[in-house]
Amino acid sequence: MKIGVFIPIGNNGWLISSNAPQYQPTFELNKTIVQKAEHYNFDFALSMIKLRGFGGKTEFWDHNLESFTLMAGLAAVTSRIKIYATAATLTMPPAIVARMASTIDSISNGRFGLNVVTGWQKPEYEQMGMWPGDDYFGRRYDYLAEYVNVLRDLWGTGKSDFKGEFFQMDDCRVSPQPQADIKVICAGQSDAGMAFSAKYADYNFCFGKGVNTPTAFAPTAARLKIAADSEGRSVACYVLFMIIADETDEAARAKWESYKAGADTEALAWLTEQSGKDTKSGADTNVRQMADPTSAVNINMGTLVGSYANVARMMDEIATVPGTEGVLLTFDDFITGVENFGERIQPLMKSRADVCPQTAASREVA
């Protein structure tokens, strides 16, 4: 099973709590995280894009770096780990993104991939005069399909004459073309998003569900397989989880309870308000799950809380879900979290025996 790190491009990572570590996003922080991830044989690093935060007393995600320029810098200071940036497709024409991707492909020597997002938080785009109107909620994947068609034209042939509703290319050129096949990923979870990923994406990210319920996302993975089968394609599922680990279950649980107790209610109220703006996409979107009050303090991503050994066991359970190729990880404290994963969790995982062969051999002897 492949492992990636969802790096903290925004302040405070993914915990909306005054009791969680408080920090600003910097290149140096993310360089340290990704270099440590590479040292421990993580397979990839992904950064999101966020153009406006949630506010509140923690100023959650009010401070963000930009994804492409950050990942270009990280590509230059790594050598093996794959690097994924995120394109906010309402803000950048596909021909520009195609050229930027080709540039980072050159910097990384073929290690670059692209995550594409349609945009769900209206104020991010409205503040710049770039929101196309609320009808966009119902048509955003039509827009994204045309966008990816243009990208693949330009990466594949260096030229596009694509004519669609949203984009019209006229002998558009991009050269040099990327040296490696640039993988396109999406995080579609609604029916429309899943249909898009089934037709156009190489991988699809989905949210894990619940606390210490590592296989609860299985129905989402099954939906993806059905959608991909209908297109005659194979699209791997990658699932998002947060790890909160310590020497004992009790110590890890105490941290989790503290984070929940310090939840930034003002920032969470903003998230809930924004999640209600999309009345077109149904109840199964990522943002609706993020705003669910059950575990909103970490936007309801799947959460693994426990001792290093128990987290390793739950990670192996994730690997048993059909169609699951990898896990995208966040941590309550990223630098310590990546180190502990590499030193204390990964060596215990049967699903990572390929990167820890000596540890796997010792388990078999025992």
Swiss-Prot record:
Residues that bind FMN: 49-50, 115, 124, 140-141, 190
Concerning CDD domains, the annotation shows: Alkanesulfonate_monoxygenase
Q: What class of enzyme is it?
A: oxidoreductase
Enzyme Commission number(s): 1.14.99.46
Leader sequence segment: none
What does it catalyze? uracil + FMNH2 + NADH + O2 = (Z)-3-ureidoacrylate + FMN + NAD(+) + H2O + H(+); thymine + FMNH2 + NADH + O2 = (Z)-2-methylureidoacrylate + FMN + NAD(+) + H2O + H(+)
Keywords on record: Flavoprotein, FMN, Monooxygenase, NADP, Oxidoreductase
Which Gene Ontology BP terms does the record give? Answer: alkanesulfonate catabolic process; nitrogen utilization; uracil catabolic process
Q: Which Pfam families match?
A: Bac_luciferase
Instruction: Name the Gene Ontology molecular function terms of this record.
Output: alkanesulfonate monooxygenase activity; uracil oxygenase activity
For this protein, the record's HAMAP family field holds: RutA (MF_01699)
* Its job: The FMN-N(5)-oxide reacts spontaneously with NADH to produce FMN. Requires the flavin reductase RutF to regenerate FMN in vivo.
Q: What does the similarity note say?
A: Belongs to the NtaA/SnaA/DszA monooxygenase family. RutA subfamily.
What is the name of this protein?
Pyrimidine monooxygenase RutA
* Native organism: Serratia proteamaculans (strain 568)
Lineage here is: Bacteria, Pseudomonadati, Pseudomonadota, Gammaproteobacteria, Enterobacterales
Q: Which gene encodes it?
A: rutA
